[in-house]
């Protein structure tokens, strides 16, 4: 059984393509017009142990908001599609990841109730073309469209780059663990996720 998805989202503002295989560790390629965002997406997908291609074109390059939001939407839909009925998945995971001064906790539930609660103290306003206000927005848009309940909390740290990168690493590791097949059951008292 291959759990994969190929999702394209095209609007008047952007064109986003995501090819994702969550069961096969392989090449990760990311191309967006935002260098630091590329770095974070590669980090996320690498720590998920996935094969992925993410391509993003900004048709109206006002700023980074549209690209960040539309990549989050498309990646979230790809994960939701790849997981299908979610039969057998572990469903829950949490990770606490250090990166030098930064320590970040991520806890998630693949619940089909997409929402995010993000508590990060990002002091720099921009890194490598990415407005840091769009980092929580990425996590919120991703969670909503993937159907994942997501909590991200900074436990310590002062370096904005380290805090953001620890968040993406922790999310990748948590997604890897929560999407693993552990049996043939639907992990819910309702019988459906």
Swiss-Prot record:
This is Imidazoleglycerol-phosphate dehydratase. GO terms for biological process: L-histidine biosynthetic process. It comes from Saccharolobus solfataricus (strain ATCC 35092 / DSM 1617 / JCM 11322 / P2) (Sulfolobus solfataricus). The keyword Transport does not apply. Gene3D superfamilies: Imidazole glycerol phosphate dehydratase, domain 1. Belongs to the imidazoleglycerol-phosphate dehydratase family. One of its GO terms (molecular function) is imidazoleglycerol-phosphate dehydratase activity. InterPro entries: IGPD_sf, ImidazoleglycerolP_deHydtase, ImidazoleglycerP_deHydtase_CS, Ribosomal_Su5_D2-typ_SF. Its EC number is 4.2.1.19. Transmembrane segments: none annotated. It is found in: Cytoplasm. It catalyses: D-erythro-1-(imidazol-4-yl)glycerol 3-phosphate = 3-(imidazol-4-yl)-2-oxopropyl phosphate + H2O. Keywords: Amino-acid biosynthesis, Cytoplasm, Histidine biosynthesis, Lyase. GO terms for cellular component: cytoplasm. Pathway: Amino-acid biosynthesis; L-histidine biosynthesis; L-histidine from 5-phospho-alpha-D-ribose 1-diphosphate: step 6/9. It holds the Pfam family IGPD. NCBIfam families: PRK00951.2-4, PRK13598.1.
